[in-house]
Amino acid sequence: MSGQQGMGDGFLTTTLDAITNWGRANSIWPMPMGLSCCAIEMMAMAGPRYDIARFGAEVFRFSPRQSDLMIVAGTVTYKMATVVKKIWDQMPEPKWCIAMGACSSSGGMFRSYPVVQGIDQFLPVDVYVPGCPPRPDAVIHAVMEIQEKIKRQKDSFQDSFLAEDDAPQVRQPESPKEKEKLTVSE
């Protein structure tokens, strides 16, 4: 864990952010959006030969409310893009996205009017995995890149509870008459 400092026998100090990021990075819950042939390679990644369980991402969640990583695998049409975006919006923060394969990254070989030429037109993509279809070890490498990105996050855990948008707003009176109205209580 980054940010750790030893303090002698049996003591270890760290920050709350470092321990939170360590937990998030080692317990990723992916949600597969298998739309094409890349989904077959994604299923192979979860099998015993590649063993994605080593990286804490063995449990695929098919509910967006229980996942924090969306793996979009395959061709996305404009009609399907609205569905993918709605599912993305249902995922809790923090969340990450992997564009798996040439079709989800850039439209692939389907350069026609109904196909979205890259899901980065409507989703923030964290890692692109090249290939048609990409091998399972390439997807595992992408999961490892997501883990490193999570570990490097700098946003403060405490600041998320004290965001300026949530702070109580105090309005100051503008005129003496308005000040009287605010001080009189009946």
Swiss-Prot record:
GO MF entry, a single one = iron ion binding
Q: What does this protein do?
A: NDH-1 shuttles electrons from NADH, via FMN and iron-sulfur (Fe-S) centers, to quinones in the respiratory chain. The immediate electron acceptor for the enzyme in this species is believed to be a menaquinone. Couples the redox reaction to proton translocation (for every two electrons transferred, four hydrogen ions are translocated across the cytoplasmic membrane), and thus conserves the redox energy in a proton gradient.
Question: Compositional bias of type Basic and acidic residues: which residue ranges?
Answer: 174-186
Q: Which cofactor does it need?
A: [4Fe-4S] cluster
Q: How does it sit in the bilayer?
A: Peripheral membrane protein
Instruction: State the protein's name.
Output: NADH-quinone oxidoreductase subunit B 1
Cofactor binding: number and manner = Binds 1 [4Fe-4S] cluster.
Q: What class of enzyme is it?
A: translocase
Description of how the protein assembles with itself and partners:
NDH-1 is composed of 14 different subunits. Subunits NuoB, C, D, E, F, and G constitute the peripheral sector of the complex.
Family, according to the entry, reads as follows: Belongs to the complex I 20 kDa subunit family.
Q: Which reaction does it catalyse?
A: a quinone + NADH + 5 H(+)(in) = a quinol + NAD(+) + 4 H(+)(out)
Note the superkingdom of the native organism.
Bacteria
The enzyme's E.C. designation: 7.1.1.-
Pfam families (alphabetical)? Oxidored_q6 (PF01058)
Which keywords, in A-to-Z order, does the entry hold? 4Fe-4S, Cell inner membrane, Cell membrane, Iron, Iron-sulfur, Membrane, Metal-binding, NAD, Quinone, Translocase, Transport
- Chain intervals for the UniProt region annotation (Disordered): 157-186
Tell whether Membrane is among the UniProt keywords.
yes
What GO cellular component entries does it have? plasma membrane; respiratory chain complex I
* Organism listed in the record: Chloroherpeton thalassium (strain ATCC 35110 / GB-78)
